[in-house]
From Swiss-Prot:
<dbReference type="GO" id="GO:0016020">
    <property type="term" value="C:membrane"/>
</dbReference>
<comment type="similarity">
    <text>Belongs to the band 7/mec-2 family. HflC subfamily.</text>
</comment>
<keyword id="KW-1133">Transmembrane helix</keyword>
<dbReference type="Pfam" id="PF01145">
    <property type="entry name" value="Band_7"/>
</dbReference>
<dbReference type="InterPro" id="IPR036013">
    <property type="entry name" value="Band_7/SPFH_dom_sf"/>
</dbReference>
<keyword id="KW-0472">Membrane</keyword>
<dbReference type="InterPro" id="IPR001107">
    <property type="entry name" value="Band_7"/>
</dbReference>
<dbReference type="InterPro" id="IPR010200">
    <property type="entry name" value="HflC"/>
</dbReference>
<keyword id="KW-0812">Transmembrane</keyword>
<feature type="transmembrane region" description="Helical">
    <location>
        <begin position="4"/>
        <end position="24"/>
    </location>
</feature>
<protein>
    <recommendedName>
        <fullName>Protein HflC</fullName>
    </recommendedName>
</protein>
<comment type="subunit">
    <text>HflC and HflK may interact to form a multimeric complex.</text>
</comment>
<comment type="function">
    <text>HflC and HflK could regulate a protease.</text>
</comment>
């Protein structure tokens, strides 16, 4: 009898404790009655806030969700711009669950993988579509303004689709290819994130960089531009050097011509002065002038070596008359 009472007491205690459940801060919960979501009298889903709550054991079960703001780090490679440039974008998305019933029905027992996959897929598609109409300059100036605002608004746009028809089934014993294809088709069928009970709070582009191929192309283009600039300056330098050389040669020729002209003028003036002095001096002594000129002629004749000199003795020769003076 005691054993029966003890067993009954244990069952009562277990039953009593299974009647209560606790929702922690930052969480929300819904009641599943025989695996189906329970509603109130107004056919609204019962969402339980943090605190201690009561349920029917073995009939009702609790599904708890994270109600905090969650962040997805996302990276997009090869995003093509309007001017055909490939960019690499590092982005992040802040989101939270705002409709726990939709979220449960859509993601299949709070499978966060499907939710994040869908959020990233929709965000990436819209971001690529937006960037394809902008060049790099417009993207940089619109990163914190219209670009992210448009994407956020489009992701949160309301839809008239019946969310109860959008249900992801979770494979218990592994995931078959058929289930994966069904899930991918469902992902494509959802036009905005409100259909799965998710709200996008903020989207941001943290970093914009170029792909490796585009970076190499930029470096090659910069090198080509600098080589062209260097070649241009070298050509300008060679041209200026040639102009300076021609100008210097012209100045040299001009200065030399001027100097030679001055020298010739001075020389001619000096010769004229000497001739005048000789003329004035010899006009006073014509015989002495004739004697000096004859001596100069003798010097020019007799100073030559290795030559035979034949002298014709003529007493009446005016050239040799000073050689016969006794």
């Amino acid at each position: 009898m005691r054993k029966v009472i003890l067993i009954i007491l244990i069952v009562v205690v277990i039953y009593f404790f299974t009647c209560f459940f606790i929702i922690k801060e930052g969480q929300r919960g819904i009641i599943l009655r025989f695996g189906k979501i329970s509603y109130d009298d107004n056919h609204h889903v019962l969402v339980y806030k943090p605190g201690l709550h009561i349920k029917l054991p073995f009939i009702e079960s609790v599904k708890i969700f994270n109600s905090k703001i969650q962040t997805i780090d996302n990276r997009l490679d090869s995003v093509l711009t309007k001017d055909n440039k490939n960019l690499v974008l590092n982005t992040y998305i802040n989101w939270k669950i705002n409709d726990f019933c939709r979220y449960y029905l859509s993601t299949g027992e709070d499978n966060i993988y499907y939710a994040e996959t869908l959020i990233k897929q929709k965000f990436n598609n819209r971001l690529r579509a937006q960037i394809s109409h902008l060049n790099i300059k417009e993207i940089i100036f619109n990163v914190k303004d219209q670009l992210t605002s448009n994407i956020k608004y489009s992701l949160n746009a309301s839809s008239k689709i019946n969310y109860k028809n959008v249900i992801f089934k979770k494979a218990i014993n592994g995931t078959s290819n058929q289930n994966i294809n069904q899930e991918n088709n469902l992902l494509q069928s959802i036009s905005d994130l409100s259909e799965i009970g998710v709200q996008i709070l903020d989207v941001r582009i943290g970093k914009i960089s170029v792909s490796e191929d585009f970076f190499s192309l930029i470096c090659s283009r910069i090198n080509s531009e600098y080589r062209a600039i260097a070649k241009h300056y070298r050509l300008m330098g060679d041209k200026q050097a040639e102009e300076l050389k021609l100008r210097a040669n012209y100045e040299v020729v001009k200065i030399l011509s001027k100097a030679q002209r001055s020298a010739l003028i001075i020389k001619s003036e000096g010769e004229a002065l000497v001739a005048k002095l000789f003329s004035d001096a010899f006009s006073q002594e014509p015989e002495f002038f004739s004697f000096i000129r004859s001596l100069q002629a003798y010097e020019n004749i007799f100073k030559k070596k290795n030559q035979n000199l034949i002298v014709v003795n003529e007493n009446n020769s005016s050239f040799l008359r000073y050689m016969y003076i006794k």
